[in-house]
């Protein structure tokens, strides 16, 4: 996603951008890389760095072409003079000339704490409940989410689907079990159940784009929001199917069976 932001700001094809994974020890103190804040905040920093980079490149291009920097316009990786059309330089040209023009051009971007950009989501689910065993089967699942702007729609769709599956796990399966003496009884993934591909249907996603007021492109965080709606959506669907309202998690077959027995159904 950051690669796409840089390519957009620099006006070049994404294949021209390479991303190096840095060591966080080499940068200043910041908050954690989480909380659905990465795309929202980091894209702002990338945007700043690219803007500064183009400013420095404009000055070098102007010196090389012997024109005023304000005379140059930039488009798709090319600086050209508004006055003399034959005066033009590509980013490739500037790169080749960098050693005799002061070395490689570097620019940085940084953001302080930004105003929150809340994300909104609604999930719709159809379930089938076995009234004898309490087993819940998901038939259809659709997730709607306002993402501000989907810079990389494929990744956004994957995040929404992954978050929904995590929420489904919390709602129907996942929960620690302790003995009377406080010993954890399901400390491995054999006993601690999580959803697999056989437990969930294909999750349809509907991406809504209502830009946030802060940050480039109106981006909003995506990753955490889809985790929450599955819990009330499934609780409501189960209630609609059985008449039983479950108020504790997980809503597994045992819990649902006992709830239906307690209701007398």
Q: Regions from the language model: what does each represent?
A:
Residues 4-265:
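C-terminal catalytic domains of large/alpha subunits in multi-subunit enzymes
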């Amino acid at each position: 996603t950051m690669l796409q932001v840089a390519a957009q700001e620099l006006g070049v094809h994404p294949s021209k951008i390479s991303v190096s994974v840095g060591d966080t020890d080499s940068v200043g103190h910041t908050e954690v890389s989480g909380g659905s804040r990465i795309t929202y905040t980091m894209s702002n920093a990338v945007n700043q760095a690219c803007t500064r980079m183009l400013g420095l490149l404009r000055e070098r291009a102007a010196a090389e072409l012997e024109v005023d920097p304000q005379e140059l316009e930039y488009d798709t990786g090319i600086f050209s003079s508004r006055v003399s059309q034959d005066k033009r330089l590509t980013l490739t040209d500037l790169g080749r000339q960098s050693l005799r023009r002061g070395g490689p051009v570097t620019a940085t971007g940084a953001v302080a704490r930004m105003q929150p950009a809340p994300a909104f989501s609604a999930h719709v689910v159809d379930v089938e409940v076995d009234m004898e065993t309490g087993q819940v089967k998901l038939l259809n699942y659709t997730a709607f989410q306002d993402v501000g702007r989907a810079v990389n729609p494929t990744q956004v769709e994957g995040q929404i689907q992954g978050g929904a599956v995590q929420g489904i796990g919390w709602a129907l399966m996942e929960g620690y079990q302790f003995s009377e003496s406080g010993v954890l009884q399901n400390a491995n993934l054999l006993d601690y159940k999580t959803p697999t591909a056989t437990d969930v249907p294909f999750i349809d996603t509907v991406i809504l784009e209502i830009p946030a007021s802060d940050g480039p492109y109106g981006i909003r965080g995506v990753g955490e929001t889809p985790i929450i709606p599955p819990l009330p959506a499934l609780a409501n669907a189960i209630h609609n199917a059985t008449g039983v309202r479950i108020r504790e998690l997980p809503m597994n077959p045992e819990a649902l069976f006992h709830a239906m027995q307690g209701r007398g159904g």
